[in-house]
Amino acid sequence: MKKTLLHYLIFSCLLALVLVGFVYASSPIDKKQYMTVTVASGDTLWGLAKQYEPAHGLSPDEFIRWVVDVNRLPSSRLTAGEQIVIPVLKSKQDGSLAVKR
């Protein structure tokens, strides 16, 4: 009886942790915290990932996936003039981020 109760308790705790994880993972991010860039002619997500690499700490694939998901882009192709949010916190944009264009 005590073993069964212990198993139910452990199962309930694990289920609660999984549910909290799902809720946290599906929470929308606050785009206002992140940098917005205007896409220039010839820009690619791969190039932007490399350009801002010191500030975001993601692999190029993770960067691209983040940008496509957060901006709800239909593909990874960019259009000159469009504005996209990138995974660089505005707090990291303190003037120390030098970017070559």
Swiss-Prot record:
Residues 35-86 form the LysM domain. It is found in: Cytoplasm. The keyword Transmembrane does not apply. One of its GO terms (biological process) is negative regulation of cell division. InterPro entries: Cell_div_suppressor_YneA (IPR022887), LysM_dom (IPR018392), LysM_dom_sf (IPR036779). NCBIfam families: PRK14125.1. Inhibits cell division during the SOS response. Affects a later stage of the cell division protein assembly, after the assembly of the Z ring, by probably suppressing recruitment of FtsL and/or DivIC to the division machinery. Belongs to the YneA family. This is Cell division suppressor protein YneA.
